[in-house]
Amino acid sequence: MLIQPVVLSGGSGTRLWPLSREKYPKQLLPLIGADSLLQATVRRVEGITGCELAPPMVVCNEDYRFVIAEQLRLMGKPGTIVLEPTGRNTAPALTLAALAASRNAADPILLVMPADHVIVDVAAFQSVVRQGAALAEGGAVVTFGITPEAPETGYGYIQSGAAYATPSAARLIARFVEKPDLATAQSYLQEGSYLWNSGLFMMRASVWLAAMAACRPDILKACQDAWALGSADGDFVRVGKDAFAACPSDSIDYAVMERIAKQAGTKADDVSALPTGVVIPLTAGWSDVGAWDALWQVLPKDSNGNVAQGDVLLQDCRDTLALSEGRLIACVGVSDLVVVETADAILVAHKDKTQDVKKIVDSLKREGRSEGSVHRKVYRPWGSYDGVDAGERFQVKRIVVKAGGILSLQMHHHRAEHWIVVSGTAKITRGEETFLLSENESTFIPLGTTHRLENPGRVPLEMIEVQSGSYLGEDDIVRFEDVYGR
């Protein structure tokens, strides 16, 4: 029995601003421990017994491709990274994964996992995965419902029906329910047959494709067309951009799962019947970490219920989350607050209002401010740069190029650049000349001059770049060669 882990990494996590941003969302962040949420998701399946485990498959937006590839490399977990040219929700993403997994006539069991969830009890998770694999192997579509701990209004619910198989705890899916109001959620908790919708699924690749053919043939056709026009590109699998842009947007639940629940009474010998939908209860410390209050709930706390990370001082505080990326945070006599510091933004919010952080991000976008979408520190396939200072006609950046990293051969129409090597060795191409710079050496790149920066060494290259000119935007780059295919 071959299980193909499929990690869906398309979310933006705007409610965890300012740490999570559009160009560097929460699944890429190490919010709990040293691993990012994506790395923790991949690591969660390690050691599942009774099956063969395929290398991970990640479906993601093109903007995240290099960071995800690097995070998998650091784990020693090379896998397939399927790139969506544009976001089309989870049903098309899973359909692309099923098509990728079906290459060479394979038909593995897909273990579908959002990249940005937390599961504390990995052993409990692996136990239900083994149960789900046995049912999925027989043709069922399996989802895992979280045993509710409170009348939560922020999650959708699954109502479980009749028992499906023994000794498994699996039950037929009776129906899917949208996020309820508080009174309805309280009644669900008392009734006992309702589970939180986790977004975790298992099914054979062929079963999912057949279900899409029955429920959303338009999505299946668009994905098949995009897949047929695709190509391998280093670590990545690209699909046809225009074909995928024509694909309708829909979620796994709306496209297939709700229809499966509605036809639960259809006879199995009816050739038009959809696969059986099954839900298995999961109690494993699950959270979708959808907002700051949810993160506070899963992080270790002191005796006063506080979470403090980074340079933080708390005096007479209760139930407060304080996270610092650099500068000192000092809180005195506060309760139920979220305080988050980054290089370019500070958030202060009451824990009861963390769902409204998204409104701040929306306001930043309307005002055209970059803080809503990008961090001051920006990651590139060759390393990173940090915007240290900026003013009229100048900008200062701290550039770090990883060992072996090579920037594109490029030129700028509107700016000149001064480069100062802080540590490491730089290989410089400037016009027709190539030379090396060491620590405390510098060079000047005139406006309009073709240039390239490389790190030929085995340690990171750190530089200070001072840009000057009439326009300093990142779109003033004309690339002539690029080893990363940008």
Which residues fall in each region the model found?
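Left-handed beta-helix
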Residues: 1, 206-420, 425-444, 451, ...
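Short coil/turn connectors at secondary-structure junctions
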Residues: 1-4, 52-54, 77-78, 105-108, ...
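Conserved N-terminal catalytic core of the sugar/cofactor nucleotidyltransferase
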Residues: 1-7, 14-25, 30-114, 118-124, ...
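Catalytic metal- and UDP-sugar-binding loop of GT-A-like glycosyltransferases, i.e.
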Residues: 8, 113, 421, 466
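Residue-level signal for inorganic ion chemistry
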Residues: 38, 97, 116, 158, ...
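Conserved core of the sugar-phosphate nucleotidyltransferase
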Residues: 121-247, 264, 274
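Noncatalytic nucleic-acid binding interfaces
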Residues: 463
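Acidic/histidine-enriched, glycine/proline-rich intrinsically disordered or flexible terminal extensions
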Residues: 476-486
